[in-house]
């Protein structure tokens, strides 16, 4: 059983890792996961955390640490999308930085796409990219609606 979080195939005594397939921003679709892409951070906006008035009794014994959330506009030469950075990820997502997002997923928020990296994914800082971000193709501005297809209406 692999515990490193990477896809690996056991072949005898050695382990062969699967090569990452890099995708472009314009190829992202709702409800998909496992994306690896190289992007530039265009802007980063802090999201004010919502404080909850009531807490369960089990969580009163430990102090609450406020979570840091930043919505970043990221992109490549094909388009851009909003990325939700949480806690330690916030430090890497500075405007102008180039990062590699590994095993990222598309989350839907109010009918729009957001890119995210959970505990199974990784964000790596990399050298400056040579591409210019195409900001006029923002996939987060496209609103999706779930339509039930069937005869029971």
From Swiss-Prot:
A GO cellular component entry from the record: plasma membrane
Question: What organism is recorded for this protein?
Answer: Arabidopsis thaliana (Mouse-ear cress)
Q: Give yes or no: UniProt keyword S-adenosyl-L-methionine.
A: no
Matches recorded under Pfam families:
Ssb-like_OB
Name-wise, this protein is Uncharacterized protein At4g28440
**UniProt keyword list:** Acetylation
Molecular function terms, GO-annotated: mRNA binding
Residues bearing N-acetylalanine are 2
């Amino acid at each position: 059983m692999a515990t490193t979080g990477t896809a690996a195939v056991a072949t005898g005594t050695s382990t062969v890792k699967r090569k990452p397939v890099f995708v472009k921003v314009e190829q992202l679709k709702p409800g998909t996961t496992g994306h690896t892409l190289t992007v530039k951070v265009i802007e980063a906006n802090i999201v004010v955390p919502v404080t909850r008035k009531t807490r369960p009794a089990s969580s009163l014994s430990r102090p609450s640490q406020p979570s840091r959330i930043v919505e970043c506009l990221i992109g490549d030469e094909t388009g851009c999308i909003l990325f939700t950075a949480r806690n330690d990820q916030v430090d890497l997502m500075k405007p102008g930085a180039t990062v590699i997002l590994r095993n990222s997923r598309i989350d839907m928020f109010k009918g729009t796409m957001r890119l995210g990296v959970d505990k199974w994914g990784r964000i790596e800082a990399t050298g400056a990219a040579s591409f210019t971000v195409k900001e006029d193709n923002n996939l987060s501005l496209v609103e999706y609606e779930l339509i039930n297809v069937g005869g029971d209406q």
